[in-house]
């Protein structure tokens, strides 16, 4: 993961690696902090695909980018799968790029982005979390989605968010969705434990970053 600076405000960080938490939220580490911050290499949950390097061997093991994850959370999905298989994602602060945030959708909050990101958030959970992990996180997930619904309702995008959630459930239980679901394996049980601890810890990190 590179240190991504905001195209229009290069003195501010746009992302220093990505995190994902038990609320079902993905967020950019270090967003809006000064460029000088986050200067140490460290492990992160995933890399923003806007500027990242991936080993070919990892894709050969976990599978490629999922075309069903078009536009949003596709990099979190790759990072999640990598974690399941025991790989680690690292932040490299010496790699600096300028990033035009929301370049595909045109703005931070709009119907296109809200619809796709909410859809993909459901699909992400379905694909990567075993049933037991979903149940373990269910109270946090319900809270996280309730907060998002209220947030987008205030912005006049509540209906679009709910519509996207419906699309996410339909995608998850469609033939294409089931085809891409990560199959649970006991040999990865320890990795799931590590992931779960990260999901809980990242809820607190969300308050800081």
What are these regions (language model features)?
Residues 20-44, 60:
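Short, flexible, basic/aromatic active-site loop/helix in glycosyltransferases
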Residues 1-26:
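Conserved donor NDP-sugar-binding/catalytic core segment of glycosyltransferases
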């Amino acid at each position: 993961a590179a240190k991504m600076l905001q195209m229009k405000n290069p003195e501010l960080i746009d992302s220093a690696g990505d995190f994902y938490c038990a609320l079902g939220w993905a967020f950019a580490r270090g967003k809006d902090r000064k460029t000088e911050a986050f200067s140490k290499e460290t492990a992160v949950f995933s890399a923003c695909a806007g500027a990242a390097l991936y080993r070919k061997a990892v894709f050969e093991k976990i599978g490629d980018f999922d075309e069903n994850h078009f536009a949003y959370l596709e990099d979190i999905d790759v990072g999640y799968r990598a974690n399941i298989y025991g790989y680690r994602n690292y932040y490299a602060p010496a790699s600096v790029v300028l990033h035009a945030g929301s370049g595909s959708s045109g703005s931070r909050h709009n119907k296109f982005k809200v619809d796709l990101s909410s859809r993909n958030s459901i699909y992400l959970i379905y694909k990567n979390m075993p049933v037991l992990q979903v149940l373990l996180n269910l109270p946090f997930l319900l809270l996280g989605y309730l907060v998002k619904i209220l947030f987008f309702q205030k912005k006049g995008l509540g209906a679009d968010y709910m519509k996207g959630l419906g699309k996410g459930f339909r995608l998850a239980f469609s033939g294409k969705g089931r085809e891409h679901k990560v199959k649970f394996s006991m040999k990865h049980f320890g990795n799931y434990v590590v992931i779960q601890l990260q999901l809980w810890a990242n809820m607190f990190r969300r308050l800081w970053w």
